[in-house]
Swiss-Prot record:
Name assigned to this protein: Molybdopterin synthase sulfur carrier subunit
PANTHER family: MOLYBDOPTERIN SYNTHASE SULFUR CARRIER SUBUNIT
Outcome, altering residue 21 to K: In cnxG100; impairs molybdopterin biosynthesis
General function of this protein: Acts as a sulfur carrier required for molybdopterin biosynthesis. Component of the molybdopterin synthase complex that catalyzes the conversion of precursor Z into molybdopterin by mediating the incorporation of 2 sulfur atoms into precursor Z to generate a dithiolene group. In the complex, serves as sulfur donor by being thiocarboxylated (-COSH) at its C-terminus by uba4. After interaction with MOCS2B, the sulfur is then transferred to precursor Z to form molybdopterin.
UniProt subcellular location: Cytoplasm
Cellular component, GO, one term: molybdopterin adenylyltransferase complex
GO biological process, alphabetically ordered: Mo-molybdopterin cofactor biosynthetic process; molybdopterin cofactor biosynthetic process
Pfam families registered for this protein in UniProt: ThiS (PF02597)
Superkingdom, taxonomy of origin: Eukaryota
Species lineage: Eukaryota, Fungi, Dikarya, Ascomycota, Pezizomycotina
InterPro entries linked to this entry: Beta-grasp_dom_sf (IPR012675), MOCS2A (IPR044672), MOCS2A_euk (IPR028887), Mopterin_synth/thiamin_S_b (IPR016155), ThiS/MoaD-like (IPR003749)
Gene expressing this chain: cnxG
Family: Belongs to the MoaD family. MOCS2A subfamily.
Length: 91
């Protein structure tokens, strides 16, 4: 079975209790939040709604509630790395 790595930072790591985990690939990018919500109930609203997502070394838009992001056709492939990056504040 092919897998991809997902990296959790800050509040995403705290919520999941993990820094990284492997998930089955391929996975449509548009299904990522629903997949994580099934594993970690409440994460979508409490954490993911304000996070950025990177696939490899590029940020990607992931829009929910039926809106279009232009990334609906992207597939997360085996060996890919995804990062969940909460907002960063600076002073």
């Amino acid at each position: 079975m092919s897998t991809f790595q997902i990296h959790y930072f800050a509040s995403a790591s705290t919520y999941t209790g993990r820094n990284t985990e492997s998930l089955p690939a391929p996975l449509p990018l548009s299904s990522l939040f629903d997949t994580l919500e099934a594993k970690y109930p409440g994460i979508k609203e409490k954490v993911l709604s304000s996070c950025s997502i990177s696939l490899g070394d590029e940020y990607v838009d992931l829009v929910s509630d039926g809106e279009k992001s232009g990334n609906e056709g992207l597939l997360i492939q085996g060996g890919d790395e995804v990062a969940i990056i909460p907002p960063v504040s600076s002073g």
